[in-house]
Structures are given as structure tokens and as C-alpha cells.
Amino acid sequence: GGFDEAFLELPGEVLARTMIHHQHFFPVAARQNGLAPSFLAVTNTAPENAERVSRNAERVLAARLRDARFFWEADRKVPLELRFERLATVLFHKRLGSYREKSDRMEELAGWIARDVLGRDDARADARSAARLAKADLATEMVGEFAELQGVMGGIYAREQQLPEPVWQAIYHHYLPVSPEPTAAPAKADLGAGAVTWAAVALADKLDTIVGLFCAGERPTGSRDPFGLRRQAHGVFRIL
């Protein structure tokens, strides 16, 4: 099936997540960069029903993409700094406060890591800025609907606001790595000049989560790790 080319104005990440995670479709890559206005779907219906199935799939996808476009346009009207202020109403943990409080801790920690651990005082300001805004997209419409895009949308919105590349790249990638696999961390080529900034912010986020939740009594057990602390610890080791 296909969809209106006007939707190609949406970030490719939004298009792909909508098709893959929400509709279970396969996006189609364009000959050059980006996606084509087409998708593939698998069905177990009789071949004579293929055209009707395709039309229904196009209709459902178009509705999802219209929603995504609405969120995209609405979110860009509000700067990330204002979204950051709204994090005061988003709870991180009952004993550790809001995501605004977590962001404040991350800002201080990321600056210290960049300067005193990684030895890059020149990256300290960018690390602090990125850490401050890293969770701001949790207060956006897009992430409210597409939770799997958290971090990614923050980076995209930061890029739209023309924040420095090391800042938006660090925000975009700060949840990574999410597994111990060698390919789980972003490649240095993708991070460019922002590799140190990303490392400082990602470490600050993971260390704040691990230490804070251990202090709050949320230690993982052999059968229970609801906050993914083992995964966070693996992430710290992969970054280092």
C-alpha cells in the first residue's frame, strides 16, 4: 500500500515507528535517503481480498499519520525549555521526586563527568545543557502517544530549535545502550563531535537511576527487576 507524500515531511523515525510498532507494516526505503510513501504488509487472507485489505490498511495508517502530524506540529510550538519546566508534574519515583528533579541532578552530574571524569572541560557546558533537556520530551504530545520515541523526539526537537549538534545528538541517543551487545551503543560516526557530550549525559542518567533506586529500596532480585537496573548497569559498562 501507500500513503500521501505530504506525510514524508514527518521525521523518518516517526513514520517508521508508526508503521512498524503500531501497524506491524514494513516501511519501504527510497532509492536515495529517507523513506518512500509505501509500505508492505503480510496477511493470511485469500488473494482475491488483497485490494480491499490494502485499502483498509492505507486508511488506518493515514489516520495514525494524521495524528502524528498533529502532535509534530503542536509540539514544535513549545520550546523544550518550557517542556522542562512541566517535568515538575511528571513523577520519576515517589521517593526520588519528579523528572524535573532528576533532570537537575543529571545536569550537575553530566557536567562533572565531562570535566572531571572524561577530562573534557570544553564539553562541560554542552553536557549540562543536554542533560537538562534530555527528559523534556516526556512532556510532549508525541512521546505521550509514541512512548518508544522518548529521547529520539527530544533530540529531533532540539535540532529543530537549532541547538548545538553535540547537545541534540546527546539528547537523541542518551537512552543508549539498552543492551550489552557491542552494537547497542551509537557509533562514533553518528555522534560526530558530540561523543563526549553523549557519554556524559548517558552516564549521568544511568548512574542517577541506579544509585537513586538502590537508595529507594528498589534493588533487583533474581526474578524481579521492574526498573531495568541490570540493563542500566550494562549500559554504564558499555559506555566506559
Task: Label the predicted regions.
Residues 1-240:
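Amphipathic alpha-helical "coupling" segments that flank catalytic cores
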